[in-house]
């Protein structure tokens, strides 16, 4: 009886478990194949992603790793080298990698209210930069600023439309604060749509543009048959399109351009056009030359050139529909649209645009810390001295994670900002890697010697077993390993 119950319990428990595949693992065919060039490049990138230290390996070892992962692939060491060279992925081939820093242009920034401790210097090599007027001590607050153009999180668009996040800043609203009755009493709800603001401050900043972007009621056709400044219906369609395509840059430049054309002073537009500026299609060349390396390493998808251009043109047509008057005036060309997108992509911080901060150039070991609020994005940013800064020294920030390997940093900088970094940290990291390579050479010779010794021993003793003395004590513990590329058991209750 007990045995029957035990079997029933076991069967019941077994029903609660499911064997599942993870990481999209599929058994590879054992039939020999000649892989497509894209498969080879993607596999090398995957190796680098899993272990960044492998980026410094020579072609021979890299080829061996590819073959080890895909024994059925018919691919030579020469082909691997040729493909990496063609796609600009040889780490020792920096001179042949595509850069576009020389195509980035900027102008003197008009009407900028600079912090007391810094001034702008324009140089031929680094473009515009911020330099210390006097000595700045470590930890000093150098300046703080609000966004020139604030962009709410694209991911929160549906929450904003449903009154569950602030219409301006995108901050998630609590159940009590989003309650219709309470928001009406506080005057934070929109009297036309279902959107709500989180505070009077956000409502005051956003109320005019909110009405123009989202309500044709407040933006009727002008008399005389002239076109609208902003077509709200077209904007709402573009907003949904951006969410569907996860196209943050198009979403952002639409909000930026709406701010520019409604700014009666005209200063915002001049300041945006004075920033470091490059066309998005030029930036794409760097991505394409890397076989989409950066995008693949970030888990994204790479469009082929024709698909990408089609997407840009679709986005451009939707952008034009939002601003019919600007189209009539000839203010929006496809070229200008591409420049706006490129400008946004190389200047934004946390999706927003800051005026003074955008003048900071890069260093992998920066002398400033730029801090943004993780809870209240509208609080802007604060810039502190990371160490003592000399008078006349350039202020720098880091565009990438300094903890990345030098190859990862170089790749991100080249693709996203168009230059190969030559800072002191990069030079030292490369020297350190070279020293490690040199020190590993004697170890390789020792390995060869051990193999020769074992071969000689085998010749002497033939098939006899070798007895090895077992240590009387062993304090180590073998590290447990789990493979995550095949099958695991998941509880389904």
Curated annotation (Swiss-Prot):
| An MF annotation (GO) of this entry | histone H4K20 methyltransferase activity
SET domain spans which residues?
A: 116-400
- GO terms for cellular component: chromosome; cytoplasm; nucleus
Q: What is its EC number?
A: 2.1.1.-
One Pfam short name: SET
Keyword annotations for this protein, in alphabetical order, are: Chromosome, Cytoplasm, Methyltransferase, Nucleus, S-adenosyl-L-methionine, Transferase
Keyword S-adenosyl-L-methionine among record annotations = yes
| GO BP term, example | methylation
Which reaction is recorded as catalysed by this protein? L-lysyl-[histone] + S-adenosyl-L-methionine = N(6)-methyl-L-lysyl-[histone] + S-adenosyl-L-homocysteine + H(+)
Q: Where in the cell is it found?
A: Nucleus; Chromosome; Cytoplasm
Catalytic class of the enzyme = transferase
In which broad location class does this protein mainly occur, judging by the first location in its UniProt entry?
nucleus
The record, for PANTHER family, names:
HISTONE-LYSINE N-TRIMETHYLTRANSFERASE SMYD5 (PTHR46402:SF2), SET AND MYND DOMAIN-CONTAINING PROTEIN 5 (PTHR46402)
Q: Which family does it belong to?
A: Belongs to the class V-like SAM-binding methyltransferase superfamily. Histone-lysine methyltransferase family. SET5 subfamily.
Function as written in the Swiss-Prot or TrEMBL entry = Histone methyltransferase that monomethylates 'Lys-5', 'Lys-8' and 'Lys-12' of histone H4 (H4K5me1, H4K8me1 and H4K12me1, respectively), thereby controlling gene expression and remodeling chromatin structures.
Record protein name field = Histone-lysine N-methyltransferase SET5
Species name: Debaryomyces hansenii (strain ATCC 36239 / CBS 767 / BCRC 21394 / JCM 1990 / NBRC 0083 / IGC 2968)
């Amino acid at each position: 009886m007990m045995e029957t119950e035990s079997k029933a319990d076991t069967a019941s428990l077994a029903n609660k478990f499911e064997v599942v595949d993870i990481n999209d693992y599929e058994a590879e065919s054992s039939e020999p194949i000649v892989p497509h060039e894209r498969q080879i490049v993607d596999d090398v990138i995957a190796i680098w992603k899993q272990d960044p230290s492998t980026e410094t390996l020579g072609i021979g070892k890299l080829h061996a790793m590819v073959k080890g992962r895909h024994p059925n692939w018919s691919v030579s060491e020469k082909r691997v080298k040729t493909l990496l060279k063609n796609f600009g992925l040889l780490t020792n081939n920096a001179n042949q990698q595509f850069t576009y820093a020389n195509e980035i242009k900027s102008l003197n920034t008009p009407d900028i209210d600079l912090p007391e401790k810094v001034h702008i210097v324009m140089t031929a090599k680094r473009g515009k930069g911020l330099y210390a007027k006097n000595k700045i001590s470590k930890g000093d607050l150098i300046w703080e600023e609000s966004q020139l153009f604030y962009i709410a999180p694209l991911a929160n668009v549906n929450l904003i439309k449903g009154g569950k996040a602030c219409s301006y800043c995108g901050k998630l609203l609590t159940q009590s604060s989003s309650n219709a009755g309470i928001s009406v009493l506080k005057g934070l709800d929109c009297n036309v749509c279902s959107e709500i603001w989180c505070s009077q401050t956000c409502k005051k900043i956003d109320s005019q543009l909110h009405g123009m972007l989202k309500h044709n009621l407040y933006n009727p056709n002008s008399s005389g048959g002239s076109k609208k400044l902003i077509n709200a219906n077209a904007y709402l369609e573009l907003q949904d399109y951006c969410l569907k395509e996860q196209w943050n840059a198009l979403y952002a430049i639409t909000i930026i351009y709406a701010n520019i054309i409604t700014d009666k002073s005209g200063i915002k537009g001049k300041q945006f056009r004075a920033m470091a500026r490059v066309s998005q299609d030029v930036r794409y060349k760097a991505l394409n030359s890397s076989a989409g390396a950066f995008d693949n390493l970030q888990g994204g998808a790479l469009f082929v050139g024709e698909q990408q251009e089609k997407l840009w043109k679709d986005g451009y047509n939707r952008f034009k529909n939002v601003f019919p008057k600007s189209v009539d005036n000839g203010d929006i060309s496809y070229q200008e649209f591409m420049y706006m997108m490129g400008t946004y992509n190389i200047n934004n911080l946390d999706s927003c645009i800051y005026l003074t901060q955008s003048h900071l150039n890069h260093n992998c070991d920066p002398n400033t810390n730029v801090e943004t609020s993780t809870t209240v994005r509208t609080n802007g940013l604060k810039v502190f001295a990371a160490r003592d800064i000399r008078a006349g020294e350039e202020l720098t920030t880091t565009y990438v994670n300094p903890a990345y390997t030098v190859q990862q940093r170089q790749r991100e900088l080249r693709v996203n900002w168009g230059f190969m970094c030559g800072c002191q940290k990069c030079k030292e990291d490369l020297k350190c890697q070279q020293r490690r390579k040199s020190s590993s050479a004697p170890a390789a010779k020792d390995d060869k010697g051990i193999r020769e010794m074992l071969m000689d021993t085998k010749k002497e003793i033939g098939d006899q077993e070798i007895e090895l003395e077992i240590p009387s004590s062993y304090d180590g513990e073998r590290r447990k390993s789990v493979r995550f590329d095949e099958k695991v058991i998941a509880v389904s209750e």
